[in-house]
Amino acid sequence: PYIAAFVVKDIRLTDDDIAELIWTQEKLHTTFCRDRKKASIGFYPLKKITWPLRYYAEDPDKIKFIPLDSEKPMTGREILSEHPTGKKYGHLINTFSKYPLFVDNNGNILSMPPIINSREYGEISSSDTEILVETTGTHKETMKQTLNILATMLSDMGGVIYSVEIIYPEGREKAPFFQKGQRYIHLDYVEKTLGIRISAKKAKELLSRMGYLVEGAHGRMIIINVPPYRTD
């Protein structure tokens, strides 16, 4: 499995903003992340976290924390058998001898991805102006693109995005992943596919409306840059 993260600071979220963020999280989980099979998302109040953070696998009977929407500490195995969210998504990890775990430098459990966050360390509120956002998953590209969507959304909400370095056994990476994606669009192919005639001028206008940066055109070919939040 993979992990990536970023920090957003100087953000002022209302209760409605948080509701929108959670709605987006669940919509991404259900659709793009394929019901958490490819990736999952977590939000954490930065003020409660001590760096560095660690993502690893642990014996489910040694995992114990109070999950979201619960009042009592539960082991990893109990979460899958008793907690509603654990029952719903437990099939993603219940065949493993060890479960994924995300902890801070003090040993505080932040979450058990892709199942559920800790109630104490993994629940944000309107009083939080600094938030850690992470994605974990088995499909790295989906995980990276999901993180980019969230970074763009939180930036649009007024937050300042800070990168987080991830240390893998094979090397280091910084997230989010905002590299430009250049693409070439051949209008002959567009016309053949859509069955309509379209001029370069009209095509550039429509692409701009869709959020693409049109860099130029050479005859019947248009050059665009794809924003990192466009995964289609």
Task: Please place each PLM-identified region on the residue numbering.
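RNA/tRNA-interacting regions in translation and RNA-turnover enzymes
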Residues: 1-232
